[in-house]
Amino acid sequence: MADFILLNEDFSDFPIGEFPYDKNHSAMGEYHFIHYPGYYGKWHDPVCNHTYNGQGASWIISEYNGKHFMEQMRIRNDKPHRTFPMLTSGDRFWRDYTITASVRMFTTKWGNAGIGFCCQNSANLLVLVFEEHELRVEYRHKEEVTILDSVAFNYNCDDTYILKAEIKGSHVICSVDDKVYFDIDTEYAVQGGKVAVTATIPAQFGFVNVTTSESTAASIDAARNAYKAECENAQAHYPKMKLLKKIDLNGCGTGRQLRFGHL
């Protein structure tokens, strides 16, 4: 039976330039996700960059010989605290899938680059990354990183590497260029979740493919629909939002000064 395609991304639909981000470093954007103008495709940037120094976008779309790439451009990931820039795709219900992606790093002196999987959110996921001249499979929880397994790997800036992670229940098999490096069992894989490209150094991603079986795809849809029905049932027990008052600000913004008490 043919694999069911969850994601088939080569970034060709993206215009050359910046992936959407909060260019104004707004107060709202500091605490909330805002859908900024621009093309997102099937991707979401869950890691805001608020260093207020005009550093620009975390991610850009570049082109070489007619092929598009998604590039990570953020070279500081320690302010205001340790962060892991990433783009995610999919949802929390994805599970038992295979992710394959290409990555080329533009420095080997520091930082990491690779793929994420079983992402419940940007602070709870598994990653397969190159770092400190090793290939590592890690569990990230908030700022803490647990190395589940590692092996020496002499990577460079000239080659493009094909990373692959196959997840089935708690079983994870990780490969680079069709060579298996890790075959582990971990409870962190059972949760399933989104996929990601992630890097703390300038790095270039050429494609991301995610596949699963037809039966698993059907069970993913069933779980998603069941959760939606559960939420709608819970919401039905509470009163709906009702407009009580409108205030004309005469063209002025609210900044941080307008609170519910003012209404």
Model-predicted regions and their roles:
Residues H141-I162:
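Short, aromatic/His-centered strand-loop micro-motif at the edge of beta-sheets
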